[in-house]
Amino acid sequence: MRSWLHLGLLFLALPLLAQSNAGELRLKVTGPDGLPIKASVELSSDALQFHRSFSTDDSGQLIARNLSFGLYRLQVQRESFSPHDGLIEIHSALPTEYVVKLSIAALSTAVNVTADATLLDPERTTTINHLDSKAIADRPASLPGRSLPDLVNSQPGWLYEGNAVLHPRGSEYQTQFVVDGIPLTDNRSPSLGPEIEADDVDSLTIYTAGIPAEYGRKMGGVIEVNTLRDARADGVLHGDVVLSGGSFDTAGAFVRVQDTFGRNTVGASASGNMTARYLNPVVPENYTNRGTIGDFSLSYDRDITPTDRLTLSVRHELSRFEIPNEQLQQFPQLQSPPGTTRQLQTRDNFETMGLASYQHIFSPNVLVNLRGMVRDNSNDLNSNNGAWPIAAFLHNEFKEGYFNAAVSIHHGRHEWKAGVESDNLFLHENFSDIVTASLTPDQNGACYPFDCATPPSFSFLGSRPDLEQSAFVQDLVHLGKWTVNAGLRWDHYQLVVNQNAVSPRFSVARHFPAASLIVHASYDRVFQTPSFENILLASSPDVTVLNANVLRLPVQPSHGNYFEFGATKSFHDRFRFDANYFRRYVDNYADDDQILSTAASFPIAFRKAIIYGAEGKVDLPHWNRFSGFLSYSYIVGNAWFPVTGGLFIGDDAVNGATQLTGHFPDSQDQRNTVRARIRYQLMSRLWFAAGSEYGSGLPFDFTGTYAQALAEYGQQVVDRINFADGRISPTFSFDLSAGAELYKKETRSLRLQADVENLNNRLNILNFAGLFSGNAIAPPRSYFLRLAATF
């Protein structure tokens, strides 16, 4: 532990930093005589679904931080003074200083603009989905471990596979979460990565195209997660308490507090959740699926001077859960030969991270940020003596040291940003298995489900560093009605292979004010590093003992070209329509596979993939009492043989070595996805909402027989699988929600929300991947309550 502290202090001493297209507003409110005024401030943007209430301090000042680039409506009010109502732009990382001079009400009238003026951001060069604190607070209920992924999955272009694994525009394991400016590139699904609770998140910004050059390595989609909250001007202790519960013995609690004294702000949060349906079960009966999760965080923020700011935080997260059984694992007497003990496999994940950032403003046009992180992550898989057909044990961990540095420069029409980053992961893998199925040949000379020559036991222990460095430069240029965002990024990756790459990025937008229209186009050259989950095992020569036929190829990084063309239009100053067409070309296309039908997976790669599609979304921020959205996604994805990386055993090895041509559907090739949610504000303190989701079904590749599938998963599941077409039957769910504000006084409130999900109680199969692993069934009809108090 001491060595990690030394390493963390070293990072803080280095000239490094980073990311996020966000700025800062420094507001001062005065009276007609120039003296400061304590006033109420409303800041909002319909384009960003953003609405915040602030108040200036006794000196008339207010600092609003972490504001995503965009156009905002600023409203300032104080009794006896005429209110101010105007627009303000945030398009620079440099603080925007703004002075509002209020006039005596009897002598002046307000400057009026309509809120609809913020429905479009004329300088946005790509479609970016943004979710703010209100959308997060009023979200539909989620099972533990999924509150954050569910929010992301509600956006166009994103799909769930089993167990809330996010797939942006057909990409496998290429999702990157950027938490308070620090990128997390490992798998953050409930089965592998402890969750940051959505109640602890202030805002989300989601990219699938036009991705800034400061982001790299995992490029299917980038999710900026902001957990930092502005301090209250009155310095009063404040926070939130949330209690929730519902179907599947689900219960949870969350608490967050924050206090400000002088130039210091201290915050803390904690949460705990439990459920009897943690993962997506493989059969409708939901066998062995209990899970508990928890997290705890502390943060400290100090404004050292008006130009220097220090932020420190530490977070600890954990999850413990069971692996769902299918029929033969739950009822060992049905196995061949019959068993006596029911299978129980468990997993646990633990993570502790410390983050530090420092900001210095050299001048009104130059700002430097430094950020660093140290992280310790471990995940385990254990099996009892009833595990079938294999008992697997896994004890993996990694330690990570990350730092970055960036400088932001405002010069005329240009917003320059340049930086460097280094990420060093020290991987440790410990895997072992014991085959519990019979390895004795039957009367036909065959064994099931493994080859008769499979070793009855196997173990692997390995360690290796994953070293990655990068540098970038980007420029946001304002040219009247045109906006250009151009960047260049260099990456170096060293693990199983050693590679460098240079990636240009370019996006452009044109605003047509008379038509309330923005058209945009983007090109992203991407360099994507493989998932490091069990990559040392898959790359080791030790695996050659598993079968007479083993194909072992080093997993190369993916190289790709992303194109997007789109438009955004405002209609009647009430709702906004976004439409995009995208096309992705990727070499060494990343995918994954399981180790001998266990719950442990590893990366593989195919020669190339071509993925294209279209997305559309209608956003209705507010119209009378209504608000909501409707989105549609169309995607076609194909991957091409041969395999170019990974581990292949038995028949898979033979096929991998001989199948050199042809293509097949990408695992996320769901042609049609529709999502909708509409909310009606019945009265000021009571609202109702309805939502639905339709998916045309994912493809699957099943190597077993119909009889085997029936024995493993039962008739209900098999009836939802189209074996002839190789696709899962369409999914559909209809949801209802209602919310009431039970109490409201000044900054204190008490809210109650009720949700009914999958009201139609349809058996929705999310994924069907083969024998003993990969199936995923969505929840049946379920009910949830959430009580939230703010003080």
Model-derived features: positions:
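Periplasmic N-terminal accessory/gating domains of Gram-negative outer-membrane beta-barrel systems
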Residues: 82, 86-101, 107-212, 217, ...
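Outer-membrane beta-barrel translocator/receptor signature
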Residues: 186, 199-206, 212-296, 307-308, ...
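Surface-exposed extracellular loop regions of Gram-negative outer-membrane beta-barrel proteins
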Residues: 326-328, 378, 433, 496, ...
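Periplasm-facing N-terminal accessory domains of Gram-negative outer-membrane beta-barrel systems
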Residues: 15-129, 142, 183-185
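Membrane-embedded beta-barrel scaffold of Gram-negative outer-membrane proteins
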Residues: 369-373, 379-380, 511, 554-605, ...
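Periplasmic-side early beta-strands and strand-to-turn transitions of outer-membrane beta-barrels
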Residues: 259-349, 379-383, 588
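C-terminal beta-signal and adjacent terminal beta-strands/loops
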Residues: 685, 693-714, 728-733, 739-791
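Gram-negative outer-membrane beta-barrel transporters
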Residues: 478-483, 581-585, 604-703
